[in-house]
């Protein structure tokens, strides 16, 4: 990861982040740089080494968090399947783009652990993590959406009637929690933006045209961030290999994907809507939490298919 990724944009470098002079859109994701600067002061390490230490710890936390997520959403998770998250992450973050931001990997660990802690009813730890994670990246809102999708209970008296009053009655505690999380998210987000209101730039990036990118990909022409179309990884057509292609296993093994795991896919529509508005969709590192969701569905589907096949042959 450290050898094959790079900081491509000068207003977002680690040095600028550490000086709190980076553009707003990057500086508001301040957690890792604060931790790194504190590590530098306490240990004498360089900023680069401190950031790498944060990244290593985040990777370990991600593996344990993803294992916990699989256990909470899948009744029969395969042993060691948490390591498969490395496949789409290595492909999206290293092979396809190689653009480094210190807050990318921590956001995935926070997403997994946020869901796990809430499902285990460790609410005090959950809200502490939620507040801290909001300093790392504003995508903590997708933890709330995932929890709502996983825990929502629907009235089952009639498949033709879905009365709102009964939905509220059945899910009063969940709605209170999600409302509280939403309020906390807005408080943390607006507080950070207020602190760095004097930084240059805007709070959201000006995005490149995805339509133009797809047109260039169809024609095989160079298009940012794929600028050497004569090579495989430099050709925009390789974008189709997003998530290392494991997304294809989700529809292929859909009937075997555990029902609880399927619910995580409800995060996809609001996630993609936000990405369309505020992110460069051709930049594969922006599909952060979707790596977790796609991999969980693929792993669950393949494992349950294998178990069903094994039962038939026994």
Model-derived features: positions:
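Membrane-interface alpha helices of multi-pass inner-membrane proteins
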Residues: 112-117, 124-150
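Aromatic- and kink-enriched transmembrane "portal" helix at the membrane-lumen/periplasm boundary
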Residues: 30, 48, 55, 62, ...
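Transmembrane alpha-helix segments characteristic
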Residues: 257-276
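Specific aromatic-rich, kink-prone transmembrane helix
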Residues: 105-125, 153-154, 294-297
